[in-house]
Amino acid sequence: MARALIIVLDSVGVGGAPDADRYGDTGSDTLGHIAERCAEGRGDRAGLRAGPLRLPHLAELGLGLAAAGASGRIPPNLTPVGPPRGVYGHAVETAAGKDTPSGHWEIAGLPLPEPWGHFPDTRPAFPPELTRALVAEGDLPGILGDCHAPGVAIIDALGAEHLRTGRPICYTSADSVFQIAAHEEAFGLERLYDLCRVARRLCDRYRVCRVIARPFVGSPEAGFRRTGNRRDLAVAPPGRTLLDRAEAAGRAVVSVGKIGDIFAHRATGREIKPGPNAACLTAGLDALATLPQGGLIFVNLVDFDTEHGHRRDVPGYAAELEAFDARIPEILAALAPGDLAVITADHGNDPTWTGTDHTREQVPVLAFGPGVAARPIGRRETFADIGATVAAHLGLAWDGAGTPFL
């Protein structure tokens, strides 16, 4: 019996999707544009990084070649030295969205059949009846925001008023999301979670995918910063996923990072949410060391997206990629005979792009492990090919979307 490890590099797209024009994202290319900026000297930051993007281990696994399949060109400095060490290709999303749950569910074999509901980019953004109900049921003096906004910017802009009035900051984006930011101490963390549970119920009628608690600390004088106590309240997947099939077969499942939230804590097994990317990867590899045969580990590394993509931070994104690349040898060393590892992404978030939202992109598919023969797999017509492949590798019965590529 075999084991499997899926690592999602949240937002590391490799070039605009065929339907990117429908989303205003034609020409977006998260990885390619980061590599270009770094090659031009525009990805430098004193004390953090400098020079071309250095991802030698990912290039060796075929990342540059996967990107070339999606965008038509190998990103600067990502040409592999020697033959690739793994299976490489790129995948197109079939779900009508560019959000985290849609991408992850499709990776797990469940493309979303209908688009999510979204709030318009107007002021106010939320229906008046939704706001009235939230204020009444949450016993609030009102809300702040009620608009599309990047999370860090709106907390900086409205944090002082929030402390003065006690009104939580409610905002949204191009994603199907209702976000509530509040001060952990002045408003209360548990009160924020309770309010988000109310919002989750109220948002169901609008087909909103996620309600997110965004706690922060600080003061107007010292500045505000978000904490690691974010909580996502997502709609449950509308059908069976790879995780459901693994659970039904009695297999061990370990979910690291945001995976538990993304799948609404259904069939997610042992959940570990240790914090930033480095801690999540360490937790995943520690879990792999004791994972029984037939088990599955699903890891999300969210900092690419939240800390750098949305903030349009090219040097930070590049440094995060380089930090992950440096740990590829550790991942390879942790794989036992019969293990399969897959590195992929769920959408794009081009830090050189306009605005602050995700970008509709293709994603890399890198599969490797002892005994996995290196070869190209070209363009996969759905992210679900990943779930189908992992299911086949684990010997799970599969009636989901997708076609195995191994």
Curated annotation (Swiss-Prot):
Q: State the Gene Ontology BP annotations.
A: 2-deoxyribose 1-phosphate catabolic process; 5-phosphoribose 1-diphosphate biosynthetic process; metabolic compound salvage; nucleotide metabolic process
Does ATP-binding appear among the keywords?
no
Give its E.C. classification number.
5.4.2.7
Looking at its record, which EC class is this enzyme? isomerase
**Can you state which reaction this protein catalyses?**
2-deoxy-alpha-D-ribose 1-phosphate = 2-deoxy-D-ribose 5-phosphate; alpha-D-ribose 1-phosphate = D-ribose 5-phosphate
**Which pathway is this protein engaged in?**
Carbohydrate degradation; 2-deoxy-D-ribose 1-phosphate degradation; D-glyceraldehyde 3-phosphate and acetaldehyde from 2-deoxy-alpha-D-ribose 1-phosphate: step 1/2
Localization (cell): Cytoplasm
Q: Where does Mn(2+) 2 bind?
A: 305, 310, 358
Q: Which UniProt keywords apply?
A: Cytoplasm, Isomerase, Manganese, Metal-binding
Q: Where are the transmembrane segments?
A: none
Question: What cofactor(s) does the depicted protein rely on?
Answer: Mn(2+)
GO terms under cellular component: cytosol
| Gene3D superfamilies, sorted | Alkaline Phosphatase, subunit A, Phosphopentomutase
Q: Which residues bind Mn(2+) 1?
A: 10, 346-347
Cofactor binding annotation:
Binds 2 manganese ions.
**Classification via Pfam families:** Metalloenzyme
Q: Which GO terms describe its molecular function?
A: magnesium ion binding; manganese ion binding; phosphopentomutase activity
InterPro entries from the UniProt entry: Alkaline_phosphatase_core_sf, DeoB, Metalloenzyme, Phosphopentomutase_DeoB_cap_sf
Q: Does the keyword Cytoplasm apply?
A: yes
State what this protein does.
Answer: Isomerase that catalyzes the conversion of deoxy-ribose 1-phosphate (dRib-1-P) and ribose 1-phosphate (Rib-1-P) to deoxy-ribose 5-phosphate (dRib-5-P) and ribose 5-phosphate (Rib-5-P), respectively.
The family classification in the record reads: Belongs to the phosphopentomutase family.
Protein name per its UniProtKB record = Phosphopentomutase
